[in-house]
């Protein structure tokens, strides 16, 4: 296939459709061709040298005035059943509005062409073409493009009938040592060249050819942050160089072999920036009869009419047949440029669908527009004394139905070059090819038909309104294309979403057209738009989700599922599969699914719905199969103990009795009881309703406690009791049995005063009623608010540890006045019946100790502390400030008496989950006073040590203020609390001097609460006005073992220090404490 005319250019003489433009120069090549000379890496400016211009005249455009309006008759493959198809003289007289050029998306002028195609949304969504195989069938002397870092790692193959012409190619090798040497390529088959070189090793690359420029537009990387990267920089490129080196032009057999090899390698998208040029003008293909043979002959005539012409050889050698085979059997999409002859018709390759109807699904023709986005690029060239020649993009012409437009001008940049400005439809086509790669990355299951439908129907309409003969479907819109098709104009759109049910794909455009949707495959497809396409929707496999309105009538096969999400609507529905009514969100708003036609649920299918959802049918409903009714979710509202009817299906007429459901299953949630289905008839039609009521929360919680961990049983039962008390109050309120409870509560209506205090309470209680029964233990436990009692008990125990530290200090003070500063760190775990709570604390104290008499020592300290407590889904933070004091009186060597005192204020801040899905926060203030009296007897131990037996009592008095949580109607409103606890203390103390400056200590003992501790808080839920209850609490171990080790050291000059470790715990509870301090003795 030889290009006419030829040009004296050194780089290439292809039929490739390009105009390569340097910074200040333009090169226009005839026959749709174009090129650049080799870049001079030592030159300034763009690095591009001389360019050539064509001097051969072009054929005049042929008028289409004779085409009749009935041109679409019997040619549905062209007109796709549309009456508004705009081609040739049927172009609309009204122009579309100017396109949105998105001029600010890519501010760098070298990326300006990306603005025209709205590429930014695709890039921001993370699509780069990764995993997509793209073929490039092209030409050009430069076979070193893969050596550029922008194209590094790509594959390049050459095809030629005369393989020996390739044996002279020399490539650079990139061994591990980083060196390089010239090697001669060896070729045993048609895969002539397949090499890789280091990204920085480009010294042997001397030319940038057409093949390099096209490859860069599709998949060039932006190196070192420079702009002008390609559309799909992570796509895998299979670069097919079809050049005949002896003639420096493309070979017909090489093109055909390239397509074959790409098909064998599984490549799905192929860029073809070349074509043949029409010399006989634009033949009127619509004037002939409809037989295939006459189409074939017309196509041959269109390609030139000369029996020796390369265009006829193309047909004789079945290149069109080869192309058609790969479209039909290899699912490949071929993208062609229209050419640069400023003609009204594109090159002949684009005409295949006239001769092979099915080929339309695998071919896209691309015209080029200027930077305005709505005009063709036109330029005049000519030598002095000759007639000027016009160059620029060919129109879509009679290929309009499979044609769109893309920028004619672009910019690329290779390493060691300045940006190269290029122009021509050779670069319009790869812009579309790169976008197709992004689309296939997002929707890897899309067929060639899916891809071309999506790319065409999402284009911005430019020129004459509708599909027109100049711009086809309009200007490529990559951002919109990434949201799926916008129309089904070519018949049914088959979405075979291969994969598993946990994978979901979304179409977010509004979809129109006369075609339908056939959903296959296991994955989910979501339709988010308001769709008006009129063909049928058939779900053969996987699930289809409707988020908006859908005009189409629908059919669900046995392996399919239709999900109406929220208040979606659709046409008539016939189902043998699954129909599922889902919630848009968790707001609890009642939503109606509207079927604008009839409903037929066959015996093999299942209707999944929930209370509060209404399936409204305008026509007749024939119901059968299985019904699965769930009371989960908030939409059913609050249920009282009496019960009420909740409608779930209404129709103009229900054609079969509701008992025709062969199987009914229900999920009542935690507290909802679904008793029976009732059918009622009214003036507006028939209705099916469920009669529902609530269960008893206390009994449900008691049953749930049997399966709860032992440590939660009491709290679960207490939470159920609290909730039942609340719901008895709600049942008695004025509107508790009203079907519009949730809506009325939300509105807080003044004409129903009984509901005003309960608005949020009804909603919170309803959420618990309709929660998952499996969450019962967690929910009931949260309604007991045990964190208040548990964190208070942990704080009281920690203050007791701090008071014991003061007591121990009295035993080892020595003479004189001593000032001491200490820090104490505590950590503990409380395990009870498989449930765990954790405590962490830190206290800083300063104090004094002194001899106040010959046998008397007194001490006082001020401490500030913070502790945290965590359990289940609740956390507490306690801040405190406390005063500690003690006095010891020695009775000679026999023993001693001690008096201890502490008084502290604390603030306990709580954050926790409550109910089904709510969160509450609160804070409570309190005081803790401790009084202790101890006596000790000294027992001689070894030669220098002392053993002391100590015992006594301590009284803890806790007073806590009333409080109310915020954030939830199921938060706790607690009464004030006063609790006194008597604690028995007994232990042993051993001291052993190591020298006159160091003493070791060891302690062991036991503590026992003589009357137990009960820090539970009476009160009620914040959303109640009368119902009462109390919080739960863990069982604080009555008996706790204590032990400790420590040392005191005199540093000299009055300075001294101490270190202590202590433990207090039981089988369920353990607290570890570490304390260090430094003091000065006056």
Swiss-Prot record:
Its UniProt domain note says: The signal peptide, cleaved at the inner membrane, guides the autotransporter protein to the periplasmic space. Insertion of the C-terminal translocator domain in the outer membrane forms a hydrophilic pore for the translocation of the passenger domain to the bacterial cell surface, with subsequent lipid-anchoring to the cell outer membrane and eventual release of the passenger domain. The translocator domain forms a 12-stranded beta-barrel with a 10 X 12.5 Angstrom channel.
Its source organism is: Neisseria meningitidis serogroup B (strain ATCC BAA-335 / MC58)
Q: What Pfam families does the entry give? A: Autotransporter, PATR, Peptidase_S8
Quote the EC number. Answer: 3.4.21.-
What class does this enzyme belong to in the EC scheme?
hydrolase
Which InterPro entries does the entry mention? Answer: Autotransporte_beta (IPR005546), Autotransporte_beta_dom_sf (IPR036709), Autotrns_rpt (IPR013425), Peptidase_S8/S53_dom (IPR000209), Peptidase_S8/S53_dom_sf (IPR036852), Peptidase_S8_Ser-AS (IPR023828), Peptidase_S8_subtilisin-rel (IPR015500), Peptidases_S8_Autotransporter (IPR034061)
Sites of N-palmitoyl cysteine lipidation: 28
Name of protein: Neisserial autotransporter lipoprotein NalP
Q: Which PANTHER family match?
A: NEUROENDOCRINE CONVERTASE 1 (PTHR42884:SF14), PROPROTEIN CONVERTASE SUBTILISIN/KEXIN-RELATED (PTHR42884)
Q: From the UniProt record, which GO molecular function terms apply?
A: serine-type endopeptidase activity
Signal peptide positions on this chain:
1-27
Q: Which gene encodes it?
A: nalP
Keywords for this entry? Autocatalytic cleavage, Cell outer membrane, Host cytoplasm, Hydrolase, Lipoprotein, Membrane, Palmitate, Protease, Secreted, Serine protease, Signal, Virulence
